[in-house]
Amino acid sequence: MAAVTWSRARCWCPSVLQVFRLQVAKLHLGRPTMRASQQDFENALNQVKLLKKDPGNEVKLRLYALYKQATEGPCNMPKPGMLDFVNKAKWDAWNALGSLPKETARQNYVDLVSSLSSSSEAPSQGKRGADEKARESKDILVTSEDGITKITFNRPTKKNAISFQMYRDIILALKNASTDNTVMAVFTGTGDYYCSGNDLTNFTSATGGIEEAASNGAVLLRDFVNSFIDFPKPLVAVVNGPAVGISVTLLGLFDAVFASDRATFHTPFSQLGQSPEACSSYTFPKMMGSAKAAEMLLFGKKLTAREAWAQGLVTEVFPESTFETEVWTRLKTYAKLPPNAMRISKELIRKNEKEKLYAVNAEECTTLQARWLSEECMNAIMSFVSRKPKL
């Protein structure tokens, strides 16, 4: 999450540096992470047997792959024949985890089983809907009309920079849209910006130890990105203005990206001593080639809308004067298409790389957790903030 906004520069002193270390470590604040021990893992194995609802074949394959990775490490079996469908599916799921460490696979297995257990014990739909609606933030607007769930970044005075609560609200909005009668979900921004990424001014209330904060942040980031990987319906970005940081890297997980000709795309990770997230270390080279991906992810090159289109990050660019009218007219037409056909087609397009995306996301979050605790990251962000750059 490389994007930062800051209200004003201040004098730096040792006490401020200590606060800043904590702020960087808490770039994402979430629920306390479980440090999955062998006992936690064994408990999760027993818990799977007690699930009241069948989680479905896709989740079963994910559980199988994580179990094998956690107990045996990277896939070491010969690839089954094409007609051995069951074992081929298992092999693909395990092999997609690549070199994911055993400890991370064990943690992911425990987290997945925990989420399955929680969902099986969830309250009735009516009560849950009322409770979840009350948790929505004014900074994320969620509306549904004409079969479209519109999710809007709504902090125009902060250039739509994302707060901790906004991350949680987006996870919730996607969860709800995945199971209701929505045909597609569309993201956009209020005001001049689409989204300026993460807002460091929200970290001043951070408490607790640095390592714990970084660990919690990695959990929230992983869950946030997984909510995009898991979304089963068409996912569209309507990029009305400049986009920075995670609002850019997430675009590789969208099914369509429509941009105004005044939009720009910027990922200043190295400038902040950080590393890519939202699976961009995988999706960007796949979309635009290694050299162009490196320009963005390593060297922080800012792309215009036309450049982003030429490199495959953007589906189509529209003149600012007609952007809203043209895009929303088209989306309303798309929303009238048979929803199950679109959902099934998306599943066919995405399913073969889904486990790969989970693995990449987990590895990126582990790497970022370490980066947030590094001196290089602390110093880079301090330098960035003190210069008050224009996004």
From Swiss-Prot:
Molecular functions per Gene Ontology: delta(3)-delta(2)-enoyl-CoA isomerase activity; fatty-acyl-CoA binding
Ranges spanned by the short sequence motif Microbody targeting signal, renumbered to the chain: 389-391
Residues modified as Phosphoserine: 99, 117
Uppermost EC category: isomerase
UniProt PTM: Acetylation of Lys-60 is observed in liver mitochondria from fasted mice but not from fed mice.
Source domain of life: Eukaryota
Classification via CDD domains: ACBP (cd00435), crotonase-like (cd06558)
Chain sites annotated for binding an acyl-CoA: 64-68, 90, 109
GO BP terms: fatty acid beta-oxidation; fatty acid catabolic process
Pathway info: Lipid metabolism; fatty acid beta-oxidation
Family: In the C-terminal section; belongs to the enoyl-CoA hydratase/isomerase family.
Protein name: Enoyl-CoA delta isomerase 2
Organism ancestry: Eukaryota, Metazoa, Chordata, Craniata, Vertebrata
